[in-house]
Amino acid sequence: PGGVIRSLKNFLFLKHAHRLLLAPSAEQPDRPSLDILPYILMPLIDGKELAKVDLEDQESLPEACQLVDENKPREKDSALRLMLVECLLLLCTSHYGRQSLRERGAYIVVREAHLAEPKEQITEAIVRLVNLLKRDESDASMKDDQDVHVSVEGEDADDDLVIEEL
């Protein structure tokens, strides 16, 4: 599963692909798309924790994530959990991605995952994600062409590409 998640994560660096990879928003239901969100959220869901969430909040989740068996555990591999959160962070680099995650209950899943997460690196990534999901969207930030830079693990600054004025 790690190779698939890593490939998906690499693909999510292409902001223009976010509209294709997420189900259409309520505003544009006729737009063709895939729906990767359930595949990203499902490993982050713990069935017992989800059962305690309000029914109204559960209904905002993608359909595949709503009726989860109470015995379903969260992904055990911390490296995979981190990559999944980073995938969500990359989706937040476009306005469409942020709106889709908000409308489809991603916050509910990461909120519960944050409470149970023992690894500090993953909790920090979740906090960055929550800050992007909960921030106020001004008119200036609502444009898809405006860049939101999100740093993810493994993204190192290449000193050879830095131009310095002398």
List each language-model region with its residue ranges.
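HEAT/HEAT-like alpha-solenoid repeats
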Residues: 26, 32, 37-49, 69-74, ...
